[in-house]
A protein has these predicted regions:
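ATP-dependent adenylation/nucleotidyltransferase module used to activate substrates
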Residues: 2-34, 38-45, 49, 55-67, ...
Length: 306
């Protein structure tokens, strides 16, 4: 794990900058130390970022790559650096090729998935998940402690009323919320949820479940939403969003959030927004500072604990 000290003199903690993830062939799981904490075997470098492949996705890639819905069901399946990693071996799957499939082939894949969905089994997934957690507990505790200390150093500079968590309903903002609540010992920090009107139903359902969770009960979530514009109607007028013209974010996200913040914080001259930005998300985000002034929203300081 490479790292550097936080440039903030009030902090000075070790900031995790990049990850090196290894594979333990003995335990058949990803590990963050070269020596496996469980079996002490030497790991081999596999990726710089990793995420689990859940059984539903596992079944899909099994169908796409082999035609057998259960082919990888008992395997340790992960995704890192845009590669699937099955039992420690990188497996290529071209998303661009799949995007070019005729609709009939996509429907056929969906039919095959639906026919086999009842066979989904979480037991193997859960087994590898438990092993992964056991092997990487020390690292988890270390980065959690560092992130908590990072948030705590803002207590002398901002009051709770001057802070907010930018909450998207995704895993990164959920972790950020947990870190902030833990570090400050309160769930009184305002959360702002940007409803772009294009959110997945699962995201909206998770937002409801988040508030029912014991830890986050009582967290106040304000929803920022542009209720005056319609996405499809604007597409007819100016064309769909593209890399050249990204009007969607400005109209349906940034603009709505800025209005909500202006209303919620009113006469505040400086507010602190905790955001779930990670360096490993993309090349552009790998260049972000951990603390910066928001380029899009005025009088907002952005801090990224994770």
């Amino acid at each position: 794990m490479n790292g550097e000290r936080c440039s903030n003199p009030d902090c000075g903690s070790l900031t995790q900058m990049t990850s090196k993830i290894y594979w333990c062939d003995e335990c058949n799981i990803p590990i963050f130390d070269m020596d496996c904490p469980i079996c002490t075997s030497k790991g081999r470098y596999i990726a710089s970022d990793i995420r689990p492949v859940f059984p539903e996705e596992n079944m899909l890639i099994s169908l796409i790559l082999t035609g057998d819905a259960l082919h990888y069901q008992k395997s340790s399946a992960w995704n890192g650096n845009n590669n699937y990693i099955i039992d420690g071996k990188k497996v290529k799957l071209s998303v661009s090729t799949i995007n070019k499939w005729p609709i009939e082939k996509v429907k056929e894949l969906k039919d095959q998935y639906d026919m086999n969905a009842a066979k989904l089994d979480y037991s193997y997934f859960d087994e590898y998940k438990r092993a992964f957690i056991a092997a990487n507990t020390d690292r988890y505790n270390a980065i959690t402690e560092e992130a908590v200390h990072y948030v705590q150093q803002y207590k002398d500079r901002y009051s709770i009323d001057d802070m907010m968590v930018s909450f998207s309903g995704g895993k990164d903002s959920t972790v950020t919320s947990h870190i902030v609540n833990t570090a400050l010992g309160t769930n009184k920090v305002l959360h702002v949820f940007g409803d772009t009107t294009l959110e997945f139903p699962y995201t909206m359902e998770y937002k409801k479940r988040f508030n029912r969770n014991e830890e986050s009960q009582g967290v106040r979530i304000l929803t920022a939403k542009n209720r005056e514009k319609n996405f499809e109607e604007l597409c007819d007028v100016v064309g769909p969003p593209s890399r050249v013209m990204r009007w969607c974010c400005t109209v349906f996200k940034t603009g709505a959030i800025q209005k909500t913040i202006a209303s919620a914080f009113k006469d505040k001259t400086s507010i602190l927004s905790f955001q779930g930005i990670r360096h490993s998300e993309s090349v552009s985000r790998s260049k972000y500072e951990r603390e910066s002034d928001s380029p899009k929203i005025t009088k907002q300081k952005v801090a990224s604990p994770i």
